[in-house]
Amino acid sequence: MESPSCIQDEPFPHPLEPEPSAPAQPGATKPGDKRFRLWYVGGSCLDRRTTLPMLPWLMAEIRRRSQKPDAGGCGAPAAREVILVLSAPFLRCVPAPGAGVGGGAGSGAVQPNTGVFIFEHKAQHISRFIHNSHDLTYFAYLIKAQPDDPESQMACHVFRATDPNQVPDVISSIRQLSKAAMKEDSKPSKDNEDAFYNSQKFEVLYCGRVIVTHKKAPSSLIDDCKDKFSLHEQQRLKLQGERGGDPGDEMGVLEVESPVSPDDSLPEKADGTVNSPRALPSLASLPALASQPALASSRVCFPERILEDCGFDEQQEFRSRCSSVTGVMQKKVHENNQKTQPRRRHASAPSHVQPSDSEKNRTMLFQVGRFEINLISPDTKSVVLEKNFKDISSCSQGIKHVDHFGFICRESPEPGLSQYICYVFQCANESLVDEVMLTLKQAFSTAAALQSAKTQIKLCETCPMHSLHKLCERIEGLYPPRAKLVIQRHLSSLTDNEQADIFERVQKMKPISDQEENELVILHLRQLCEAKQRTHVHIGEGPAIISNSTIPENVTSGGRFKLDVLKNKAKRSLTSSLENIFSRGANRMRGRLGSMDSFERANSLASEKDFSPGDSPPGTPPASPLSSAWHAFPEEDSDSPQFRRRAHTFSHPPSSSRRKLNLQDGKAHGLRSPLLRQSSSEQCSIVPSARRMYKESNSSCSLPSLHTSFSAPSFTAPSFLKSFYQNSGRLSPQYENEIRQDTASESSDGEGRKRTSSTCSNESLNAGGTPVTPRRVSWRQRIFLRVASPVNKSPSAMQQQKDGLDRTELLPLSPLSPTMEEEPLIIFLSGDEDTEKVEEKKKSKELKSLWKKAIHQQILLLRMEKENQKLEEARRDELQSRKVKLDYEEVGTCQKEILIAWDKKLLNCRTKIRCDMEDIHTSLKEGVPKSRRGEIWQFLALQYRLRHRLPNKHQPPDTSYKELLKQLTAQQHAILVDLGRTFPTHPYFSVQLGAGQLSLFNLLKAYSLLDKEVGYCQGISFVAGVLLLHMSEEQAFEMLKFLMYDLGFRKQYRPDMMSLQIQMYQLSRLLHDYHRELYNHLEENEISPSLYAAPWFLTLFASQFPLGFVARVFDIIFLQGTEVIFKVALSLLSSQEALIMECENFENIVEFLKSTLPDMNTTEMEKIITQVFEMDISKQLHAYEVEYHVLQDELLESSYACEDNESLEKLERANNQLKRQNMDLLEKLQVAHAKIQALESNLETLLTRETKMKALIRTLEQDKMAYQKTVEQIRKLLPADALANCELLLKDLTHPTNDKAKAGNKP
């Protein structure tokens, strides 16, 4: 048979010329299709509980059935020769011409009829490829039987190639076809647009996050979080002020270190209290990002991690979204995430509150999809947060801060550890928050309804299919003899009848190798597990939920299976105790074998005894082969409490397929478990750090290291030890000869067998191929090692160990345990002189320092290489982005002389020198290079500003672009809706919420915040889009301000649209004066300019015309201003006047103006641009504007002249009534004035009398004071008796006077 190959653009098979004038057939291959001659082995539908580890065995079963069709009574057909035709987007399996079933190659001269095929399906529906490690010519792929039905089963198709080198070619070709088909499907379609518009998007301001203890939020949680964020911001500003506002100092002040004690990292409850250590004991091991701020580090990795102090977990993966961000952006984000900064602790920074950085752009797009929430950063053009609805427990809105809301979700900073995080956001106003909450509620309800409709695959710990999954995981990558041992251990957990049944079936098929026997056993095990799974009762499910017809069978089978589980546990405990006894025999046997290599393998096999098939299932069992979880092998982790995971310090990270060979507990093996110090990868030597040493029988080699890792494929254990612990623990007879051969070879060769390690090279191990491990030696053994070890060691190996190992002192001549770190081989190599030891120690220190220096230099080199790669990738991305932006056909050609002229002019742009406008006009007329168009626009804007100074009252607000992006806009809904409508076919803007749309959102949002009067109006998005295609965001923002304010385009976007009405009148007058027939034709059909010309003015022709033409129009607009639009419109209408006149009705004319008119060729566009340069209508436009205002005033005046008589009479009657009212009011006013005058005269009289009385009172007071002085003097002169008599006399005189007065008052 001919060697397989991929023949392109030629018919298959064999390189023959295609038949001339072959008739076209429905299924005929097209030029460019790829065809491969293969053998179709067969296919099979998979059980929904089939996982990835089971697939190789299923593939082997299909292959075996094709080789032996009658085996197992399956009656499967033999393999047939086929042609795999890759015709986009289909993958078609066609029978090979002239080849019978199971036959050889047929006639190669026959053209294959691709219209008749065995099966076909779309390439993008293929989900996974499977290789056969035992036979590289076999491969398979998985595909859904019904791609449109998510509940459909998976199908597996197996093929065989005649050459192993053909398999990668076939797979890569299918993958390329699949990618091309997926890319074609991802193009904007109606369904995609509907999905895009159905997902609600809101602009929010990210405030921060707080760790909470419960998944349900109290009503005041959002307000409490907001208060804490405000407090943190005040502290930050205060500290920044104390440091003098130095950004570098601020960085250090706000950094926080990991808490010293576990209690410091406890999260805070919603009410402000801190949990007790008992509430969350596992939080003590949380990383810094989960418990305290790390503000400086977040400044570096902010694009991926939106949190200022700590971002998301590094293990969190961002899915590649075709509608959100490119893979390059995500790669940059992930690389930025790897950067870290040193941290310092500050006492005032809270450890549980994680606010965002107010100095960064915290505005995000909050997208609510069907099943997830996405937080997209328009600043970094990436998805910074993605949460599924199943991880969100509650949403709430602020009470005091009504414009804030948040949600609580579950996160896992470490495997097996989960916590609840509350993310807080702010919206522009309260109504927007209400809309967000309503959208979330509806989305949750819809997702719950859709999820409940799906059939969930249930798995529990006792599921038969789950036990099969664990077994396939356990034997994956093992050699057939060792896998056979694991399978036999699993079979021992079955009942006696099941074991006997499987044994009989396997023996009937007469396997000839261990691999074939394993495949047969797995086949029957899978059939047994599928049968048991049908009647299996999951844990927690009672028989009450089962129908009456199946209750007896299910109950008995469920009870039987639970009984089997208990039996298995008892068997495992008994087996482990027996194996502990057998292991002692293995220890004695090691002395007889005299080889540490075999002992190491025996220990590695003994470590397999702890692997139990009854491990607990994962929390979320795999639902399908595509989503099946790859769990760590049970061999990788030790359940013993004395072992703990060590840090990897080797030169490359550990792979998931590594195994650790661990010695077991001392009670089981008669050994102690020493604690070993981790060795470095550079020296590749394992130095002991424990004081305990093993006491073993005489051997020429030391024990293997406890924590030496070996990759699974490189493990080569001797065959006689692979069944050492099988059944009774005795060696099987078939391996006795191998034992003798191994013993003889190892006794003759002192080095033994060398094993390759996956973590270090052979030179890093000792001469025997095993790492050095401490053991207890007596003084006799020490003397023996001094004498015997050099015989078995080569000088090179001794010298290598002497140079590479650290020195320790000699063991004391005593059987007691040593008092310091010791190692037998090092002791032997050590000298007796103290001076030699000191020198060697110094030498070891120097080596360590040299190694450290080399490591640091290597790290720096790697970092520099990474930075260079990033810079190179950034340059490539920039070039690619620029290429995508400028992907349009340019109108006109630009000569080399024009490029040189423009380069000279752009130099003046930097120096701000005025240039001759006639020269600029001439150069612009000759052409503009597409690559320098953005710079030329900036140059033209600068020249305009140098000649025209905008008044201060018309100047835009002086706010920077970055500051505007930090704010929230009220125009977000209108902007977000128009993103998908702006240049929907251009590759830069076609990606939904891609880099182009997010840049456009930023630009439109910034201008809406800058110009409060205009805000956002439809049409500005196209103008901004054209600017973004030729320059960066900030430059486009400056040019947009120039167009709006300096050139005056913002007038036509005002809410009253007055300027647009004037422009429509001016265009009508131009048509009336210069193209009267066309004007009359349009008027007869009632077609006003606002019907077809409004988009031309609002979008500057960008919404309907080709980008090359629009770019040339923008060239002239930057030079001449708004009148260019009238010139272009007039030229367009005049050039197509004859065709417009041929349209007879309203519909035809409108269709022509909207569809046919923009579809021009390059020649017509160049002609129009030339006419625009030669046209001058500025005077006419000014005259028409004045005319419009005059007509508007006349219209207002004429409205007053047309008032009728009734209105006049009403006004006269109203006037007479008002006159009478005025007269009455005047009379009342006169009376009031007279009263006021009388009151004023009375007031004057009273004031005069008051003044007189005050003067009289003052006189009387003076007299009183004089009399009082006289009385005092008289009292001093008279004696006391005379004075008393005088007082009595005065009383008497006073009483009669009073009596008379009273009598006078009586009537």
Curated annotation (Swiss-Prot):
It is found in: Cytoplasm. Residues 927-1121 form the Rab-GAP TBC domain. The modification Omega-N-methylarginine is found at residue 584. The modification Phosphoserine is found at residues 258, 261, 320, 324, 348, 351, 573, 577, 595, 598, 616, 624, 673, 758, 761, 764. Phosphorylated by AKT1; insulin-induced. Also phosphorylated by AMPK in response to insulin. Insulin-stimulated phosphorylation is required for SLC2A4/GLUT4 translocation. Has no effect on SLC2A4/GLUT4 internalization. The keyword Phosphoprotein applies. Widely expressed, including in pancreatic beta cells. Residues 53-209, 319-475 form the PID domain. The modification N6-acetyllysine is found at residue 484. The keyword Repeat applies. One of its GO terms (biological process) is vesicle-mediated transport. GO terms for molecular function: GTPase activator activity. The modification Phosphothreonine is found at residues 575, 620, 649, 770. Its main location: cytoplasm. Residues 1-30, 237-276, 330-360, 603-684, 732-774 are annotated as: Disordered. Residues 757-767 have a biased composition (Polar residues). PROSITE patterns: PID (PS01179), TBC_RABGAP (PS50086). Residues 13-23, 615-624 have a biased composition (Pro residues). InterPro entries: DUF3350, PH-like_dom_sf, PTB/PI_dom, Rab-GAP-TBC_dom, Rab-GAP_TBC_sf, Rab_GAP_TBC_domain. The modification N-acetylmethionine is found at residue 1. May act as a GTPase-activating protein for RAB2A, RAB8A, RAB10 and RAB14. Promotes insulin-induced glucose transporter SLC2A4/GLUT4 translocation at the plasma membrane, thus increasing glucose uptake. This is TBC1 domain family member 4. It comes from Mus musculus (Mouse). The gene is Tbc1d4.
